[in-house]
């Protein structure tokens, strides 16, 4: 009995320090963030310029890093919440260094908490 109070106190402290589940991404913020990132790419800005602006957007896109040019894109009207992240499908038209243009179906995974991060999902369907 004399150990019950200290044990309960320790348990309360431990449980009080544990964070709850992470917040889900804000779907109303995800779409405009993705559009801003795609417009930056299309206009010739670098990924670093996108990260340096306010609000900062981190976009991990290999084709952009490889200096493929985004000629055009078409986002689906709505993204979907998948787990705690937003998934948005986009038709993109890319031009490589030789000038050849190709259409691609892309799927972007967007997180808005604690910061805006956009990653192209090359493995998902």
Regions found by a protein language model. Name each.
Residues 1-4:
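Positively charged n-region of N-terminal signal peptides that target proteins for export
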Residues 13-16:
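C-terminal motif of bacterial Sec signal peptides marking the signal peptidase cleavage site
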Residues 18-20:
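Bacterial signal peptide processing site
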Residues 24-32:
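Soluble non-cytosolic domains of exported or imported proteins
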Residues 32-71:
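Post-signal-peptide N-terminal segment of Sec-exported extracytoplasmic proteins
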Residues 72-77:
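Short structured motifs
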Residues 81-125:
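Exposed beta-sheet edge and beta->alpha loop/turn motif
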């Amino acid at each position: 009995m004399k150990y019950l109070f200290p044990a309960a106190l320790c348990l309360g402290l431990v449980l009080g320090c544990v964070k709850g589940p992470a917040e889900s991404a804000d779907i109303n913020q995800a779409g405009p963030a993705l559009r801003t990132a795609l417009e930056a790419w299309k206009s010739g800005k670098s990924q670093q310029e996108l990260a340096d602006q306010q609000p900062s957007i981190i976009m991990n896109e290999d084709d952009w890093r490889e200096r493929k040019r985004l000629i055009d894109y078409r986002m689906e009207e709505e993204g979907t919440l998948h787990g705690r992240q937003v998934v948005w499908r986009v038709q993109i038209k890319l031009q490589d260094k030789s000038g050849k243009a190709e259409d691609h179906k892309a799927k972007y995974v967007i997180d808005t908490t604690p910061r805006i991060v956009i990653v192209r999902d090359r493995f998902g369907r």
